[in-house]
Amino acid sequence: MAFSSCFLLVLLQIFSALLLCLAQDQSGFISLDCGSPRETSFREKTTNITYISDANFINTGVGGSIKQGYRTQFQQQTWNLRSFPQGIRNCYTLNLTIGDEYLIRANFLHGGYDDKPSTQFELYLGPNLWSTVTTTNETEASIFEMIHILTTDRLQICLVKTGNATPFISALELRKLMNTTYLTRQGSLQTFIRADVGATVNQGYRYGIDVFDRVWTPYNFGNWSQISTNQSVNINNDYQPPEIAMVTASVPTDPDAAMNISLVGVERTVQFYVFMHFAEIQELKSNDTREFNIMYNNKHIYGPFRPLNFTTSSVFTPTEVVADANGQYIFSLQRTGNSTLPPLLNAMEIYSVNLLPQQETDRKEVDAMMNIKSAYGVNKIDWEGDPCVPLDYKWSGVNCTYVDNETPKIISLDLSTSGLTGEILEFISDLTSLEVLDLSNNSLTGSVPEFLANMETLKLINLSGNELNGSIPATLLDKERRGSITLSIEGNTGLCSSTSCATTKKKKKNTVIAPVAASLVSVFLIGAGIVTFLILKRKKRTKLGLNPNSGTGTTPLHSRSHHGFEPPVIAKNRKLTYIDVVKITNNFERVLGRGGFGVVYYGVLNNEPVAVKMLTESTALGYKQFKAEVELLLRVHHKDLTCLVGYCEEGDKMSLIYEFMANGDLKEHLSGKRGPSILTWEGRLRIAAESAQGLEYLHNGCKPQIVHRDIKTTNILLNEKFQAKLADFGLSRSFPLGTETHVSTIVAGTPGYLDPEYYRTNWLTEKSDVFSFGVVLLELVTNQPVIDMKREKSHIAEWVGLMLSRGDINSIVDPKLQGDFDPNTIWKVVETAMTCLNPSSSRRPTMTQVVMDLKECLNMEMARNMGSRMTDSTNDSSIELSMNFTTELNPGAR
C-alpha cells in the first residue's frame, strides 16, 4: 500500500517530537555499557538513552572494544564489551526492589575484539538458565529479553563458560514496567516476537517511540494487506503500545479469509503467553461492522470481539497456551456471520515461558556470605553468583541443603587456609542452618565470640591454627562438655577457658615459674580433656548414652535413627523434667485444647511460646502413641510438619512440647470458632497445598516411608502467618525397609476420614492417607461436616458425588466464599478429591500428584486475584483471553 504524504507527515512529527524531548523520563531505566572505563557515560544519539559504565556492578572480567570499522553499523552501547577469560561463572549484581517488574535485555556483539568470533556460552538469570548465546562471526548481533518480576531485592545476571570459548557481553539494559502488565501464573517471559503488524516502514524502533523501550519489528504477510490512518489513536491502557504501531494494521487480502498466525520451529513442550493490541482505524459506515472471534488450534477462545474506534484494546491470555497433539500453535482471527468487514490486527507480542525452577539461596544467608566475602577479602575465583545453586557452580568450601520446593540453606562453611585476618565476623551468625564452621589455619585475632555458642545448629567448630586470645565463652565450653558440639582450638596460644583466665590474672604478679607451671598444667589438662572427650565420644558410638538433661539416668526413647546415626536435632529437641514442664506452663495455667491423647497447654520456653501436650493416663496405648510420636518427630523435619521442641517422660508424667501454632487448627477456622473472618479460596488452596506437601514428604521423603493414619482438619495447624503444618503423629506408622507395599495393623483413625479398604482388610498403605486427605479437600470446598445424618447422603463424599451426578456444583460450594473464586479451580479440587476417595486404593493418586494439582490451582487463583486488582485507564479495553475458563458454576461449560 502506498504511504500517503499526510500520514508520513504525522509519523515524522510524532517521531521528531519524541526524539527532541531530551529530558524525557528515563526513571526506572538502568543502561549499562559493558566494558567501558569506570565513571564514564554517554547519551546514545539515536535513542537519547544515557548509558553508564558497568564497572560498579561487577568485579570480574576485562574490557574490550569492537573494530573501528564496525562502529558506524551499530549503536554506541555495543562498541565496548566485557569478556571473562577467568572463572566459570561471572555475575552482575543489581540491587532493586522486590516485587517490581522489569524488562531485562542482554546485548551481544563480538565485533572482532579478539580472533575467535565463533563462541558459545550460557546466560543465567540468578541460578536459572536463561538462554544459550552463540555467535558465528564478528558482525552477528544477538539480543535476549526477559520480563521478570523480582522475587528478592537483588538481581544477578551471570555468564557461564561451557567450553573453551570466552563469554562476553556488550550491554545490559533494565526497563521498569507497570506491575499490572505481563502477569503469569508461574515463571517469567522470554520474548519470542514483538511485531508492528501492518507496518509501512521496514525498520524497527524502540525508546523515543516506545515509552518502555520495547524493541518492535515490522511484520507483514503475503496474504495480508496494510491499512493506516492519519488520525491519532488513544494508546492509554496499561500496555501503552506505541502509537506508530496502532495507526497501522493488517487485514486479510481476501475479506472472507481468516488471519492465521502460526508459530513454527518450536518444540512442542514450549508454553506461550500472547498479547494482541487492536484499534479500529477506519471510519465505519453506519451499516458496517467489524466483528471476529479469536481461535486457537481450531478452538474458540474469545469473541465475538469488536475493536474500539481509534482506541487501543489489549487482549491477552491469563494462562499459558500449549501445543496441540500435533505440536501446532495456530492463532486465527475469524470474522463472524454478522460482520461486514474482515478482522484486523495492529500489534502483537508473544512470549515463551521460562519456569525458572531453581529457587535462590535464602536471602539473609546470601547477604551474610557477601558480607563475609567483602570483609575478609576472599578472592576465590568461583565465589560468584548464588553460593549454593545451581549445584554445578556452587561456591567452593560451601555445602547446602537441597530439598524440593524449599529455599537452599548453607550448612557448612570451610574457609580454612584462606589468608583471613581480623576478628571472627558476626555475619556468620546469620547462617542459621550452619552445622560445620572451619576457620582453621588463618591469622584471625581477637576472642572467640559468644554468638557461636548461640547458633543452635552448629555441631563442629574448627578454630585451630589462628592467633585468637582471651577466654572461650562458658556456654560454648559447656556445650562441648555435653557432647553437643565439637570444638577445635589447637594452636591459639592466647586462648584459655574462663577459669584459667581468671587464675592467670590473679597470679599475674607471681614469679615466672608460676605461669610456666600453670601453662604446663593447662596443657596437660586440655590434653587430658581431649583424650577423655574422644574416649567418651567413641563409647557413645557403641553404647546408648544417658540423657544429660533428664537427671534420672533413663535411656532416651530414640537414640539412633533408622539410618544408624544419632539424629542431628537431639540436642535441640531435648528431654525435659516434669518440673521443667510445670515451669514452662506456669503450673498448667492456660488450656489450649483437649483431645483423645490429653490436654494441650500454653507455655513459654526460652522466651518463645510453645504448646505442651500432656498424656492424661499412662495407658499402654497412650504410651505407645507417645513413644511413636517422639521417635518420629526426632527424625522427621519439614517446614510443613509441626516441630517438636522437647519432651518429658518421668513415670506416668509424659508430655510433648511443640512450636506454638498461633492460629489453631483448620477446623476452627472453617467452623467459625475463630471469629467472623473467612478463609478465602486462595487461602484454603494454600493451606491444602502446604499440608499436602507435608504428607507427601512423609510418604516419599522419609526412609522408611511413614503413613500418618489420622489426617483430618483438626490435625492441620496454622501458625501466625497461616502457614499450614500437619500435627498429631501418635498413630503414625513406619513401613519396614524393603519391598513391602503394605503392613497389616489394627485399624486406627477417625470415623469419616477412615479409608474403607483399610477398615475392611486391615492393610495399611500410604493410599489410606490419600483417602483421608480427599475428605479434607471436600471440607475446604464445602465447609460441610464430614458426617451429617440429616443429609440425603450422610458421608460428605457420597453427598458431593450425588450433587455432581445432578450437575449441581453450585450447592456444594461454601456460601461464605460469596463467589470469590475461579470456578475452574473449584472443579479441579473437587475432581482431585473424588479421585482420592476412589474405593480402590490402587486407583487413587499419589500425594505427589495431589501436590501438583493443588499448586496448579493455587497458581491459577493467585493469577486471577492479581488480574482482578488490575486497573485500566480505558475501562474495558484490556481483555483477557479466557482459555476454557467459565464465568458461571455450570458443569455443562466444562
UniProtKB/Swiss-Prot annotation:
Tell me which EC number(s) this protein carries. 2.7.11.-
A GO-annotated cellular component: pollen tube
Residues binding ATP are L592, G593, R594, G595, G596, F597, G598, V599, V600, K613
Q: Which residues are glycosylated?
A: N48, N95, N137, N179, N223, N230, N260, N287, N309, N338, N399, N441, N462, N469
Regions that span the bilayer: 516-536
Where is it made, tissue-wise? Answer: Expressed in roots, cotyledons, leaves, flowers and siliques.
- Cite the entry's keywords alphabetically: Abscisic acid signaling pathway, ATP-binding, Cell membrane, Glycoprotein, Kinase, Leucine-rich repeat, Membrane, Nucleotide-binding, Phosphoprotein, Plant defense, Receptor, Repeat, Serine/threonine-protein kinase, Signal, Transferase, Transmembrane, Transmembrane helix
Membrane topology (Cytoplasmic) = 537-894
* Compartments, as annotated in UniProt: Cell membrane
Residue spans, topological domain Extracellular? 24-515
**Active-site residues (renumbered):** D710
Sequence ranges assigned to domain Protein kinase in this UniProt record: 586-858
Q: Which Pfam families match?
A: LRR_8, Malectin_like, Pkinase
Which residues carry the post-translational modification Phosphotyrosine, per the record?
Answer: Y658, Y758
Residue numbers of Phosphothreonine PTMs: T577, T745, T750
Membrane topology reported for the UniProt record? Single-pass membrane protein
Q: What happens when the gene is disrupted?
A: Reduced infection by filamentous (hemi)biotrophic oomycetes (e.g. H.arabidopsidis and P.parasitica) and fungal (e.g. E.cruciferarum) pathogens, independently of plant defense mechanism. Hypersensitivity to abscisic acid (ABA), displaying enhanced ABA-mediated inhibition of seed germination, root elongation, and stomatal opening. Impaired repression of ABA-sensitive COLD REGULATED and RESISTANCE TO DESICCATION genes upon oomycete infection. No obvious modification of defense-related gene induction during pathogen attack. Hypersusceptibility to the necrotrophic bacteria P.syringae.
Q: Which signals induce this protein? A: Accumulates during infection by filamentous (hemi)biotrophic oomycetes (e.g. H.arabidopsidis and P.parasitica) and fungal (e.g. E.cruciferarum) pathogens, being locally expressed in cells surrounding the pathogens both at early and late stages of infection. Induced by microbe-associated molecular patterns (MAMPs) flg22 or elf18.
Listed SMART domains: S_TKc
What is an annotated GO biological process for this record, any one? response to fungus
Record PTM Phosphoserine, positions in chain = S744
Free-text function comment from the UniProt entry: Negatively regulates the abscisic acid (ABA) signaling pathway. Required for full susceptibility to filamentous (hemi)biotrophic oomycetes (e.g. H.arabidopsidis and P.parasitica) and fungal (e.g. E.cruciferarum) pathogens, probably by triggering the repression of ABA-sensitive COLD REGULATED and RESISTANCE TO DESICCATION genes during infection, but independently of immune responses.
**Which family is annotated?**
Belongs to the protein kinase superfamily. Ser/Thr protein kinase family.
Protein name stated in the entry = LRR receptor-like serine/threonine-protein kinase IOS1
Q: What organism, scientifically named, is this protein from? A: Arabidopsis thaliana (Mouse-ear cress)
